[in-house]
Amino acid sequence: MLELTSSEFIYTGNPDMNEGKMTRLRASIVCEPTLAMCARQIHLQEYIMLGKGEDLTGGRTRDSIISDALEALIGAIYLDGGFANAKEFIHRFVLNDLENKQLFYDSKTILQEVVQAHGLEVEYELTGEEGPEHDKKFHVIAKAGNLFVVKGTGHTKKAAQQQAAYNALLHLKKNGTQFMPKGK
């Protein structure tokens, strides 16, 4: 349901885009972090029923659980209200603000391109970690010369770097840096 609706949306909105670009764009929409972001925007995590142990160990903030809940909600809407209602929900809550979602999904790559255009390199530094082994939270900073120094947090080092890269792009955009991902 989600992939079908996303594919149709991308194709009808970009009929001249090549297949590879369409595939990458769809992947950026239906990936776990993006779906978790969509779920958080509608506060879905507040309504997920979890076991006590899962709730106590941070399950309510875990991307995998939140994104799965969004997919389950879409399935429930489809079963209860039919294809048209599920499609409307996907358009309203998943396919909205695609530029921002694509920026989040590709943030490390896009940031690297932007920073290299300024003759610099992005450095990621692990500044801390907290929590038990099964529910670690990593903190990193990303910096590039005097362009930016920003923080990111995630349940993996990679996720923390991705969040820091996204924050750096938002910072650069806010300060007027023009950029567009290559091949998008």
Task: Describe every region a protein language model picked out.
Residues 1-184:
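Double-stranded RNA-binding/processing signature
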